[in-house]
Amino acid sequence: MRQFQQIRFFVIAFFICLLLGQCQQINSNADPINRHADHLIYTHHARCRMDCRHITETEVREILERGEIDYKKSEPDAKPDPKYALEGNTSEGQHLRIIFAPSQRGLVVITCIELGVEWQCDCH
């Protein structure tokens, strides 16, 4: 009888672990940033980079809405705010990487990079 209870305990524990694993998997598929933020907050650095690289606010929104998160270039555990690198091509043909940081104030645009093109920017 005692052996039956032990087996039953392990079977139940196994199914609970399976269920928790599925829940974590479902949550990990959720997008960590609001891709339809009403208001973006641009840092001075982002504005400077956008200006010298000819990147418009419309293109920033394109990448936000349709870009892929590059987790190798992102810092999801950064404090106080995580940072996510989104990459994609704009309708103008630019291949961009834009760093976004969700914060309590809103979605902050940290910097904008045109991949594969070297621009001479004097942004400090």
Regions found by a protein language model. Name each.
Residues 2-124:
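Ribonuclease/tRNase effector modules and their secretory precursors
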